[in-house]
Swiss-Prot record:
A molecular function (GO) term: metal ion binding
Name this polypeptide is given: F(420)H(2) dehydrogenase subunit F
4Fe-4S ferredoxin-type domain span: 5-34, 46-76
GO process annotations (BP): methanogenesis; methanol metabolic process
Entry membrane topology: Peripheral membrane protein
Gene coding for it: fpoF
UniProt EC number: 1.5.7.2, 1.5.98.3
Keywords: 2Fe-2S, Cytoplasm, Electron transport, FAD, Flavoprotein, Iron, Iron-sulfur, Membrane, Metal-binding, Methanogenesis, Methanol utilization, Oxidoreductase, Repeat, Transport
Places the protein is found: Membrane; Cytoplasm
Signal sequence coordinates: none
Subunit structure: The FPO complex is composed of at least 13 different subunits.
Reactions accelerated catalytically: methanophenazine + reduced coenzyme F420-(gamma-L-Glu)(n) = dihydromethanophenazine + oxidized coenzyme F420-(gamma-L-Glu)(n) + H(+); reduced coenzyme F420-(gamma-L-Glu)(n) + 2 oxidized [2Fe-2S]-[ferredoxin] = oxidized coenzyme F420-(gamma-L-Glu)(n) + 2 reduced [2Fe-2S]-[ferredoxin] + 3 H(+)
Stated role: Component of the F(420)H(2) dehydrogenase (FPO complex) which is part of the energy-conserving F(420)H(2):heterodisulfide oxidoreductase system. The membrane-bound electron transfer system of the complex plays an important role in the metabolism of methylotrophic methanogens when the organisms grow on methanol or methylamines. Catalyzes the oxidation of methanophenazine to dihydromethanophenazine. It shuttles electrons from F(420)H(2), via FAD and iron-sulfur (Fe-S) centers, to methanophenazine (an electron carrier in the membrane).
Length: 346
């Protein structure tokens, strides 16, 4: 019997988080724009350059796939604390630099020995990397709005390190949580990012920025989604923007089925929505998240009641789910297994 992820791939809703590649015992899965699994009954996958080994049907991947697991109806139900924060060392960071600040402080305190993150080159092409020091964290500052299989890097991390932090968008945070609960407890902290949608890097770098926005990618120093637009800032001080509604159609297909905006499965979620300019919004979701944030609190400035607060976050949650929930429920009808949007707390 093929694993459940084969159906996820078939229906083009694979999030390409990389979890299946990270945990497959024999290396039968590789993740590119979507997962690809070697199935002896489907020779077309051999032609696509999928993994070297043939799937043996252990079904480990079915236990850690965020799409197979489904979504949570109320993603704010598990928020223990919500506040604004800014790292005291946030030069070069996006907004308040909280994510980088947490990782740097935990490395310096010896609480983690590895963090999985994304860096980029001067062409904004992303690369998943294993960070092993506070100095390494400096290379990953700033948000990247293109998708890469971050969680796949855990395969190497599990072999070399014992106290691993994972930073990722909702599907990646979800996958990391499932791996921690079902496969490997070396993941000690999951930091989830707020995400409306993401783009394949070739679409962003070859289509949206040069063709639609008429900007040279190599001139860009910062990108951000805010106030209903996608903004890019260039070396010469120019600012360019395009309405998000004009480029949303170019987002990855699984993003149009995603019903998690705030990384509900993370220990700590970090974003900018709900906090003033220059600050991050911080959601403490688990006892683990509370413990680790308390360790680094002295490295942060805290705003106890940020505005516009959770009211705006809630509006964006509803905005993301408005069409996506229906799309996801429709594809769920095609699966041979049960999944969907469930009313429970994680």
């Amino acid at each position: 019997m093929p694993p459940k992820i084969a159906e996820v791939i078939q229906h083009d809703v694979c999030a390409a988080c990389g979890a299946c590649e990270a945990v497959c015992p024999i290396g039968a899965v590789t993740v590119k724009k979507a997962a690809e699994i070697r199935d002896p009954n489907d020779l077309s996958l051999y032609e696509k350059g999928a993994a070297f080994q043939v799937c043996e049907g252990c079904l480990t991947c079915s236990r850690i796939c965020p799409v197979v697991d489904g979504f949570i109806e109320n993603e704010l139900l598990n928020v223990r604390k919500f506040f604004g924060a800014k790292s005291k060392d946030n030069a070069g960071s996006q907004d308040g630099g909280v994510t980088s600040g947490i990782l740097k402080a935990l490395f310096n305190k010896g609480e983690i020995d590895c963090a999985v993150g994304i860096t980029r080159n001067e062409n904004w092409e992303p690369e998943v990397v294993l960070l092993t020091s506070a100095e390494d964290v400096e290379r990953t500052r700033g948000t990247k709005y293109t998708s890469d299989p971050v969680v796949a890097a855990l395969r190497e991390a599990f072999e070399k390190y014992d106290r691993i932090a994972v930073v990722g968008v909702p599907c990646q945070a979800h996958a990391a949580r499932l791996i921690r609960e079902n496969v490997n407890e070396k993941i000690v902290l999951i930091i989830g990012l707020l995400c409306m949608e993401s783009f394949h890097h070739d679409v962003m770098l070859d289509k949206i920025i040069p063709e639609i926005m008429k900007v040279n990618v190599r001139d860009i120093v910062k990108m951000e989604f805010t106030k209903g637009k996608f903004w890019v800032y260039t070396k010469d001080g120019e600012v360019h923007s395009v309405p998000i509604k004009d480029i949303a159609k170019y987002a990855r297909n699984p993003c149009h089925h995603c019903c998690d905006y705030t990384s509900v499965f993370a220990d700590i979620s970090v974003g900018s929505v709900g906090a003033p300019d220059g600050w991050n919004s911080v959601f403490i979701r688990t006892e683990i998240g509370e413990k680790y944030f308390d360790m680094v609190r002295d490295e942060m400035e805290i705003m106890e009641d940020p505005k516009p607060g959770l009211e705006l976050v809630g509006k964006l949650i509803e905005m993301k789910r408005k069409g996506n929930a229906e799309h996801f429920q429709e594809v769920c009808k095609e699966f041979s297994f049960e999944t969907g949007i469930r009313s429970e707390t994680v």
